[in-house]
């Protein structure tokens, strides 16, 4: 399978991160990248250069909170959703589903629909 391009990922990254945090409670950066890679069977590989700016923006916007933890004498920064984040993730998932449906209409048009 071919990897999905960076351009396609960039527009979806916020929703991907929010959905993972909703499902897992709290996660650290490397854990997020590994989960995405596993769930997509290697088709999506997040770089830290793409992930961390999104995490920092979501934190700045009050959608995520951070918590430091110590693991094997290493500091890990865990991210989790705020109450505001819980409502934002629901909206982002709805938007993404609508977007995917719209793309399906373009890629595989239904017979009889007006394509003008």
Residue ranges and their predicted role:
Residues 1-6:
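Short, Lys/Arg-enriched N-terminal segment that forms or immediately precedes the first helix
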Residues 7-50:
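N-terminal helix-turn-helix DNA-binding core of bacterial DNA-binding proteins
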Residues 19, 34, 56, 90, ...:
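A cross-family signal for key residues in well-ordered alpha-helices
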Residues 51-58:
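Basic amphipathic alpha-helical segments that dock to polyanions
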Residues 62:
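Glycine-centered, phosphate/nucleic-acid-interacting loop/turn motifs that mediate DNA/RNA or nucleotide
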Residues 66:
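Short beta-strand "wing" residues that participate in macromolecule-binding interfaces
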Residues 71-93:
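Basic, amphipathic "hinge/linker" alpha-helix immediately C-terminal to the N-terminal HTH DNA-binding motif
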Residues 87-116:
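Amphipathic alpha-helical dimerization/coiled-coil segments
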């Amino acid at each position: 399978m071919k990897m999905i391009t960076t351009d396609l990922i960039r527009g979806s990254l916020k929703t991907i991160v929010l959905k993972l945090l909703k499902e897992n409670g709290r996660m650290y950066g490397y854990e997020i990248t590994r989960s995405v890679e596993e769930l997509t069977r290697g088709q999506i590989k997040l770089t830290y250069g793409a992930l961390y700016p999104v995490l920092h923006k979501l934190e700045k916007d009050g959608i995520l909170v951070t918590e430091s933890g110590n693991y094997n004498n290493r500091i890990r920064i865990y991210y989790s959703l705020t109450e505001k984040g819980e409502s934002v993730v629901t909206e982002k998932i709805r938007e993404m589903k609508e977007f995917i449906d719209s793309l399906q209409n373009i890629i595989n048009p239904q017979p009889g629909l007006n394509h003008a």
